[in-house]
Design a protein with these regions (language model features):
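Short, flexible coil/linker segments at domain boundaries that flank nucleotide/cofactor-interacting
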Residues: 1-4, 83-84
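Two-component/phosphorelay signaling modules centered on CheY-like receiver
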Residues: 3, 14-41
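Acidic, metal-coordinating helix/loop segments flanking the phosphotransfer/catalytic sites
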Residues: 22, 36-54, 61-62
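His-Asp phosphorelay/catalytic-motif detector in bacterial-type signaling
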Residues: 51-53, 82-88
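The feature encodes the CheY-like receiver
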Residues: 62-67, 96
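Short amphipathic alpha-helix used as the core "switch/output" element in two-component signaling
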Residues: 66-84
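A short, hydrophobic beta-strand element within the central beta-sheet of small alpha/beta folds
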Residues: 76, 85-100
Length: 100
């Protein structure tokens, strides 16, 4: 019996990085890309509707609809959703980021 692929959500505002993540995911049969967004607000909506088991999250979202470019706020709001599961979150950033 074949297992279901892991559902992944990408929240990334850099198009090059986003395309790199998408290309990596497309090469795998055990992973399914359920949504891609550059917005923390839309990301939370996708978590509710798509229920991803994994989230690739950019640390600094310059296109944030909430006005907050800090992804830690997204994580706090994710916790407030009180999901019946805990998605795995992978946080990404650039080497020359102010946060690194």
């Amino acid at each position: 019996m074949e297992s279901k692929p892991m559902k992944i959500l990408i929240i990334e505002d850099d198009i090059v990085d986003c395309n790199n993540f998408i290309n990596c995911i497309k090469q795998r049969k055990d992973v399914e890309l359920v949504a891609v967004t550059d917005s923390d607000v839309d990301g939370l909506k996708y978590v509710k509707t798509k229920q991803p088991e994994g989230i690739v999250l950019d640390l600094e979202l310059n296109n944030s609809k909430s006005g907050n470019t800090d992804s830690f706020e997204f994580l706090a709001n994710l916790k407030k959703l009180k999901l019946n599961y805990e998605p795995i979150v992978i946080v990404t950033t650039h080497v020359n980021s102010k946060r690194t």
